């Protein structure tokens, strides 16, 4: 089901892009840095790609693809036991939406789409029994979550062929019946042609 939704979203955005190349007035391709804070986890970092198509109107279409990842380790020790854990998070989002050109230099945009998050957790521990025997245990948990993602931002064109953008991206992920917010930013530079 998740793959079907992702494939459908990709086809829709690809259709916009294909049509854009056929009748293109102005295109912008940009790449940038993305960083988000996952609730109850540390920051995840990655890359953001933007594509924008403008025609003879102040309203245009923009698409965004983001990939981020991060990992966190923790350990706990008391008198009789030691536990070590590691969590890896991967995040993907695909969004599209309208952009509005305020003047020759500044535009604002809004995005809506889907975000897919995956977490892999591994826990390893040892326990020392009273008789001196050591008992080891380990566990691995893999969870996935797909939710609606949203974003907004500003694009600046200081010169005709240069594009600078800064934006917000947000969603949530549900793992083990707990919802975790994911909020972050992306900044980038692009070429307008």
What feature does the model see in each segment?
Residues 25, 43-47, 88-92, 144-148, ...:
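Residues that define the transmembrane beta-barrel architecture of outer-membrane proteins
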Residues 35, 53, 98-100, 114, ...:
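Residue-level signature of outer-membrane beta-barrel architecture
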Residues 33-37, 65-71, 90, 114-120, ...:
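Transmembrane beta-strands of outer-membrane beta-barrel pores
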Residues 1-26:
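Cleavable N-terminal export/targeting peptides
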Residues 156-157, 163, 181-193:
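Outer-membrane beta-barrel "beta-signal"
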Residues 27-29, 57-63, 105-108, 156, ...:
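Repeated loop/turn-to-beta-strand initiation elements of outer-membrane beta-barrel proteins
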Residues 20-74:
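Short glycine/proline- and aromatic-enriched beta-strand/turn motifs that initiate or cap beta-hairpins
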Residues 40-46, 72-82, 120-130, 175-183:
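Outer-membrane beta-barrel translocator domains and adjoining extracellular loop/strand segments
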């Amino acid at each position: 089901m998740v793959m079907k939704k992702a494939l459908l979203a990709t086809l829709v955005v690809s259709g916009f892009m294909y049509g854009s190349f056929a009748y293109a007035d102005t295109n912008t391709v940009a790449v940038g840095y993305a960083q988000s804070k996952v609730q109850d986890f540390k920051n995840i970092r990655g890359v953001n790609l933007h594509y924008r198509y403008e025609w003879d109107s102040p309203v245009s279409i923009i698409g965004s693809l983001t990939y981020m990842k991060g990992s966190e380790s923790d350990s706990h020790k008391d008198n009789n036991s030691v536990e070590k854990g590691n969590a890896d998070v991967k995040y993907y989002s695909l969004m599209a939406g309208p952009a509005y050109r305020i003047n020759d230099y500044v535009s604002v945009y809004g995005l809506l789409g889907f975000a897919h998050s995956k977490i892999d957790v591994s826990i390893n521990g040892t326990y020392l029994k009273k008789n001196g025997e050591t008992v080891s245990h380990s566990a691995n948990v893999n969870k996935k979550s797909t939710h609606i993602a949203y974003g907004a931002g500003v694009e600046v064109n200081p010169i005709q062929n240069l594009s600078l953008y800064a934006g917000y991206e947000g969603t949530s992920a549900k793992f083990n019946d707990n919802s975790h917010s994911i909020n972050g930013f992306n900044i980038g530079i692009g070429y307008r042609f």
